Regions:
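Vicinal oxygen chelate
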Residues: 1-12, 15-25, 53-58, 79-166
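Short beta-strand/turn micro-motifs at beta-sheet edges
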Residues: 5-8, 77-83
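Core segments of cupin and vicinal oxygen chelate
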Residues: 11-13, 20-73
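Alpha-helical elements of the RecA-like P-loop NTPase motor core of helicases
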Residues: 30-31, 104, 141-142
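Short, charged, solvent-exposed linker or helix-capping segments at domain edges/interfaces
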Residues: 65-68, 78-82, 153-156
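Acetyl-CoA-dependent GNAT
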Residues: 70-76, 146-147
């Protein structure tokens, strides 16, 4: 190995880039995430082990955070026999909404589709107003309002945060 990258653009420091989930049907999962979140398909692929897809926020090309979905073909799961357990009930992906009404709207849509897991409900201050929805594989996605993530990050780290040390 030469240490050379196959890509022209990459991070200058260790950077949070993705979370990966095993799914039963990558196409159904893409459709669900595009219907219930702001994520959009960035790339898809297939190899001898299965199918995959990358979804992300198209408004953040300079600091992408990607949801990787992987569907393994029968007998081709490189992690077998370990089971792929869904995230939940506490483990979840969090999306902060701009308003309480936005949380109510997604909760109503999820309830109509049969995938509302919790709420909407007002939780303690550091959690905010939330609902939990379930993807086709049972993974939990939280929509919240007023958690204060943006405010706390700017308060502690400022707009020009120092790079993390590795």
């Amino acid at each position: 190995m030469t240490g050379q990258s196959n890509h022209a653009v990459g991070p200058k420091r260790p950077t949070w880039t993705h979370i990966a989930l095993a799914v039963r049907d990558v196409d159904a999962s893409i459709a669900w995430y595009e219907a219930f979140t702001h994520l959009r398909l960035l790339a898809r692929g297939e190899d001898a082990d299965g199918k995959n897809a990358w979804l992300g926020d198209p408004t953040q090309p300079d600091s992408p955070f990607i949801l990787v979905l992987g569907q393994f073909f029968e007998g081709r799961d490189p992690f077998a026999p370990a089971p792929h357990l869904p995230m939940g009930p506490f483990a979840h992906m969090g999306i902060e909404a701009p308003s309480r009404e936005a949380v109510d709207e997604i909760a109503a849509r999820a309830k109509a589709a049969g995938c509302l897991g919790l709420g909407p409900v007002q939780m303690p201050k550091q959690i905010g107003y939330v609902c939990f929805i379930k993807d086709p594989d049972g993974n939990t996605v939280e929509y919240s309002f007023d958690q204060g993530v943006y405010e706390k990050a700017r308060e502690v780290w400022g707009r020009q945060a120092q790079p993390a040390r590795v």
